[in-house]
Amino acid sequence: MTINILKKANGVKRVFAAVLAVTTLVSVAACGSDSTSASLDSNSGKTTKITVGVCPGPYGDMVEKVIGPLLKDDGFELKTKLFNDYVQPDKALASGSIQANLMQHINYLNKFTKDNNLDLTSLGQVPTLGLGIYSKKYQSIDDIEDGSTVSIAADGSNLARSLGVLEQQGLVTLKGDIDSTKASVNDIASNPKNLKIKTLDAAQLARSVDTVDVALVPGNFAWAAGLKPAEALATEQQDEGVINVFVVNTKDVDSDFGKAVKKLLTSQEFKGAIAKSDFKDFGKPTTW
């Protein structure tokens, strides 16, 4: 009997110890969660490190050479993480593996967050290198021949954007009763040169210049591939929807970091730094 009682007592102790261990782990995890949610606030004179997701192109340089140095006095140290497509930077931001990104325009952000149920918000616009029409076969828009193959981005917002640029140049006409930010190939009402539209992942468009007659390449991928804007047959007429934006999780908009970035992006200090940088000829934010 005594042995059974001791066994039961020892069993109770083991159960209690296990429960205590689990409780401790939960408490630690909760504390860790609180720390993460506050991680974008400045920290009593210490430097807060921020990882910004970027895609190939100029915006990683913009973060490292202009935005980062200007935020140093606010207590933030920015570094970039490179992604090779437009999908992963927003997913990484939503998951918390990065704290911000700079790689997309507002039309793309709005559509992607809606389609993927993400809670991300723009802090403001940055100077943006527009989409260009590139060709190794033709020297001008007027040279484009009947039946030419034209590559454009496959993702919804950039596909619509590319069709809009083709329409700006008189190469196609879109249906009049559609939302131009959601246009698809099926919304082409008139295609007088019988262009063959080929949709590709945006990251492949710069390489496609070698294999198609004409390619519409977003500015960041054109920059990364060494395609110069001056060599484009034409560039898009930018509006607010296609100006790139600096993005964070919505919960971080009012953090110290969110407030500092939002203030910086419309400041004379930022405008002056851009004017002296490699980005001086980019399309300017509509907020300037």
Indicate where each model-derived feature is located.
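Ligand-binding clefts/hinges and TM-proximal coupling segments of bilobed small-molecule sensing domains
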Residues: S157-K182, K262-W288
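Bacterial signal peptide processing site
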Residues: G32-S35
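A conserved helix-loop-strand patch within extracytoplasmic ligand-binding domains
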Residues: L123-V172, K271-G272
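A bilobed periplasmic-binding-protein/Venus flytrap-type ligand-binding module shared by bacterial periplasmic
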Residues: G130-I141, V242-F257
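Short, polar/charged alpha-helical segment
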Residues: K49, G57-K79
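C-terminal motif of bacterial Sec signal peptides marking the signal peptidase cleavage site
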Residues: T24-A30
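Ligand-binding "clamshell"
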Residues: K111-L123, Y138, T211, L216, ...
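Short helix-initiation/N-cap motifs at beta->coil->alpha
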Residues: T80-K91, I178-R207
